[in-house]
Regions:
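Active-site proximal loop and beta-alpha junction motif in alpha/beta enzyme cores
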Residues: 1-74, 79-302
């Protein structure tokens, strides 16, 4: 049996940058074991499989696999899969914005697809309501796992905290780009720290950026998911936005910002984040988006 697939680069406007994603637009009765085997063979941070939805609101149901396991939600798979399905004509497009609903493991979430001249552009997803874990008090285990002196973490003057808008990630602030470049993660040790916190990934960021229009520079490590480093992580961009809002880093009058990621991997990415807040300034709605570029189309023999 041969299964069609498409590979796209997400959170970029040019090929061979951003975060690559394999999309199987028709899962054709594959078993869970076959889906996992295909994801392992593709060896990308995620591979998605599109099925008929069980929720009548949804345009489709998407299952997401890393090389190691199935996960209930992820950012760049949501954006990239919606783009592929829009280009394939799987639902009607209306200018300037087409809203669809995408069924994933955490529920059915809305996505807005920007459309110009009948062509899909940026895809923006609405993530779940943010939730916040306890602040990490002992800096030594995470510092050792990242190959840093604990004093470097202390210089950031911001807390290390697990945050979720669908998937929980440990948000780790650094003071500057120099310390970001000095990261030498011990993935086994980092996996232990993340498991102890119930987090999927470690999203390390600094407010010092390379691009003048970016607000934060980030790197992502998810060893438990089989992803040593990820070039663009939408599921962590939302939690970072909520974190920056709660800790007073993002000005109240600022509603959106850009995260640059993947630069150290040679796959520069740009993730757009929008924050809506209540009267007290607490984040209520998180939207994350970006553009997608098609790269490869082919078949997988199963």
């Amino acid at each position: 049996m041969e299964i069609a697939f498409e590979q796209v680069d997400v959170f970029t406007d040019r090929p061979f940058a951003g975060n690559p994603l394999c999309v199987v637009p028709d899962e054709a009765g594959l078993t869970t074991e076959q889906m996992q085997a295909i994801a392992k063979e593709m060896n990308l941070s995620e591979t998605t499989f599109v099925l008929s939805p069980t929720d009548p609101r949804a345009a489709y149901w998407m299952r997401i696999f890393t090389p190691a396991k199935e996960i209930p939600f992820a950012g760049h798979p949501s954006v990239g899969t919606a783009y592929v399905m829009a280009c394939a004509g799987r639902f009607p497009l209306h200018e300037p914005i087409t809203r669809i609903f995408q069924q994933v493991g955490v529920g059915t979430l809305p996505l807005d697809i920007e459309v110009a001249d009948g062509t899909p552009g940026r895809v923006v997803m609405t993530q779940g309501e943010p939730s916040f874990g306890e602040v990490l008090r002992d800096l030594t285990p995470i510092a050792d796992a990242l190959g840093l002196d604990p004093l470097i973490l202390a210089r950031a003057k911001l807390p290390i905290q697990a945050v979720s808008t669908g998937l929980e990630h440990l948000i780790v602030p650094l003071p500057d780009l120099k310390s970001m470049a000095a990261l030498r993660p011990n993935l086994s040790a980092l996996d232990v720290v993340l498991r102890d916190r119930g987090a999927l990934g470690c999203f390390v960021f600094t407010l010092e950026t390379i691009s003048s229009d970016a607000f934060a520079h980030a790197r992502m490590f998810a060893p438990g998911a089989g992803v040593p480093e990820d070039p663009a992580t939408g599921s962590a961009a939302g939690p970072l936005g909520a974190y920056l809002a709660v800790h007073g880093v993002l000005p109240r009058e600022r509603e959106s910002f850009v995260i640059e990621q993947g630069i150290e991997m040679g796959r520069p990415s740009r993730i757009w984040v929008e924050i809506a807040r209540d009267a007290a300034g607490m984040p209520t709605t998180i939207r994350v988006g970006g553009t997608t570029v098609p790269v490869i189309r082919g078949t997988i023999r199963v």
